[in-house]
């Protein structure tokens, strides 16, 4: 849960200070992630913060997983860069927007491919998955099982099945077992997270490439341990 020290610090920072602090920002390509102090702030759920948590887990970089309550959010909201979470505090510098955070950490942890073309393709995958994520929000937050099932049925044919078919094809055409390039990237973690979100609703045995992919990513050091210990939440 959020600490009073964190709230006071957030309240005392203006918008410019929250986004940049020239004294502590490091040159690109010369970063030592373990020397930074990271605090990730989000609700007690996977949602838009889970790919970020997977990045930390895979890179074996420590951070504070600051899970706030709705009451705490009322106080914190006007003090965030864009009025929503997740947000990441990096040694006093605050960054908003989940994909911007993924881009920052992916670059620091070596998970954005090996060249600018691969980086662009990785971000294309991230943005494509975000389109599906947006459509799934009502379903992920619905607690009534009957309504939840109906919501998923409505989305299945139009959005979920095309997603599964598309990424099954991508992996079948891949010679590396990865979505982009020849090593694990933010794209892999983004697709993995979406498949884990859909786990109870889809039959991955009908998609052998995706099933193998989920097993491979899920067994990676750091990822395996995080999946086992992460809090059980409804979204």
Swiss-Prot record:
The protein's Enzyme Commission number: 2.5.1.18
Gene Ontology MF annotations: glutathione transferase activity
GO biological process, one term: glutathione metabolic process
Keyword Transferase: yes
InterPro entries noted in UniProt: Glutathione-S-Trfase_C-like, Glutathione-S-Trfase_C_sf, Glutathione_S-Trfase, Glutathione_S-Trfase_N, GST_C, GST_superfamily, Thioredoxin-like_sf
Domain GST C-terminal: residue ranges: 115-235
Pfam family, one: GST_C_3
Residues of the GST N-terminal domain: 36-113
Reaction catalyzed: RX + glutathione = an S-substituted glutathione + a halide anion + H(+)
Keywords linked to the UniProt accession: Transferase
Positions with a binding annotation for glutathione: 42, 73, 77, 85, 97-98
Family classification: Belongs to the GST superfamily.
Record text on subunit structure and interactions: Homodimer.
Descriptive protein name: Glutathione S-transferase 1
Organism: Onchocerca volvulus
Native organism taxonomy: Eukaryota, Metazoa, Ecdysozoa, Nematoda, Chromadorea
């Amino acid at each position: 849960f959020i600490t009073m020290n964190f709230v006071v610090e957030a309240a005392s920072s203006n918008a410019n200070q929250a986004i940049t602090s020239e004294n502590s920002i490091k040159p690109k390509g010369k970063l030592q992630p373990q020397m930074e102090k990271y605090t990730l702030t989000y609700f007690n759920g996977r949602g838009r913060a889970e790919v970020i948590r997977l990045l930390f887990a895979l890179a074996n970089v420590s951070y504070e997983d600051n899970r706030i309550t709705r009451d705490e959010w009322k106080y914190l909201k006007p003090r965030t860069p864009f009025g929503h979470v997740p947000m990441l505090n990096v040694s006093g510098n605050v960054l908003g927007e989940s994909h911007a955070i993924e881009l920052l950490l992916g670059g620091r942890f070596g998970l954005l491919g090996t060249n600018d073309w691969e980086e662009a393709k990785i971000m294309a995958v991230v943005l494509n998955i975000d389109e599906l994520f947006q459509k799934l929000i009502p379903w992920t937050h619905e607690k009534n099982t009957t309504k939840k099932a109906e919501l998923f049925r409505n989305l299945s044919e139009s959005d979920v099945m095309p997603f599964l078919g598309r990424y099954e094809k991508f992996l079948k055409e891949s010679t590396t077992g990865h979505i982009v390039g020849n090593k694990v990237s933010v794209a892999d973690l983004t697709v993995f997270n979406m498949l884990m979100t859909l786990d109870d609703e889809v039959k991955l045995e009908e998609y052998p490439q995706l099933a193998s992919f989920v097993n491979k990513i899920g067994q990676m050091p750091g990822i395996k341990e995080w999946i086992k210990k992460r809090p059980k939440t409804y979204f």
